[in-house]
Amino acid sequence: MHRELIRDGLLVTLAGRYKEDPVQFVTLSKQTLDSAVAREAVAELRNEGYVEEQVRGVIRLTPRGYRAYRNEPLPYAYKN
C-alpha cells in the first residue's frame, strides 16, 4: 500500500511538471532518496519506460509515462 502511494505521488508530481514543460527534470528530495521504497518505485517506473533518470534522483516523465498516467486513473480517484 505504502509503495503504491509513493508511486502514485511521483506520477502526479511528474505529470504536473510534464504539462508545464515536458523536458524539465524534477530533483527528488533527500528524504525521498533515502527511502528504499521510493527508490524502488522510481526503478520500477524507469524499467517500465515511464520515467527517464538523468542522474540518481533527477527524473522526468517520458511521453509514454504521461500517456499511461492520463489513460489510467489512480486507484484512490475512485469513489466508494
Where are these regions (language model features)?
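Short amphipathic alpha-helical interaction segments
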Residues: 2, 31-47
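Short amphipathic alpha-helical interface segments
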Residues: 2-31
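Alpha-solenoid repeat scaffolds
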Residues: 20-21, 52, 75
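A composition-biased, non-transmembrane "mature-region" signal
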Residues: 22-25, 42, 79
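A short, conserved structural fragment
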Residues: 46-56
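Minor-groove-contacting beta-hairpin "wing" of winged helix-turn-helix DNA-binding domains
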Residues: 57-63
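Short, amphipathic alpha-helical interaction segments positioned at domain boundaries
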Residues: 63-80
